[in-house]
Design a protein with these regions (language model features):
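Short, ordered, surface-exposed loop/turn motifs in non-cytosolic proteins
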Residues: 46-70
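A short, solvent-exposed beta-strand micro-motif common in secreted/extracellular proteins
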Residues: 84, 88, 92-110
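A short, amphipathic beta-strand motif
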Residues: 36-44, 56
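Tryptophan-paired
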Residues: 62-91
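C-terminal motif of bacterial Sec signal peptides marking the signal peptidase cleavage site
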Residues: 16-19
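Bacterial N-terminal signal peptides that target proteins for export
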Residues: 1-9
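Beta-strand-rich domain onsets/edges
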Residues: 21-37
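Structured interaction patches on ligand/partner-binding surfaces of diverse proteins
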Residues: 22-23, 103-141
Length: 141
């Protein structure tokens, strides 16, 4: 009987101590973002090419040095009234130097390319400011 009573007492103490909170935390501290997003719309001017590839890239340096932080192949089917909505998500908190749109007549990464447009100003993604909208134009002319 003494052993059973001791076990119940220890179990009760454990349950009570685990159920008590030491201190309340601010709810916003628990909801801090873990990554950032850069998104926006590209307005295309001119005629979309019938061959080759159009590519959007996000780079930490400009001119680019090494692989991009993000990229996407763009297609004419993705356009709505001459606009293409893009999004780079799950980004590390840091500064990004450029979003660029390029046209590769012979397909990426072969041959030469034409720069169609972009945003070439620093974009700082931080935990306090994790989302940024960047809209710009790209020209096929």
């Amino acid at each position: 009987m003494h052993s059973t009573l001791s076990r119940l007492l220890v179990l009760l103490i454990l349950l009570v101590s685990m159920g008590c909170e030491d201190e309340k935390t601010n709810e916003t501290d628990n909801n801090l973002p873990e990554s950032g997003t850069i998104h926006g719309a590209i307005t295309f001017n001119g005629t979309w090419p019938e061959t080759g590839q159009v590519l959007i890239t996000l780079d930490t340096n400009y001119p680019p040095q090494g692989p991009p932080s993000g990229f996407e192949y763009l297609t004419a089917e993705g356009l709505t009234d001459g606009e293409y909505n893009y999004s780079f998500s799950n980004l590390s908190f840091r500064s990004y130097a450029a979003i660029s749109v390029t046209y590769w007549p012979e397909g990426y990464p072969n041959g030469s390319y034409n720069s169609l447009g972009g945003n070439f100003q620093d974009m700082d993604i931080t935990q306090d400011d994790p989302e940024m909208e960047i809209n710009f134009s790209a020209n096929f002319e």
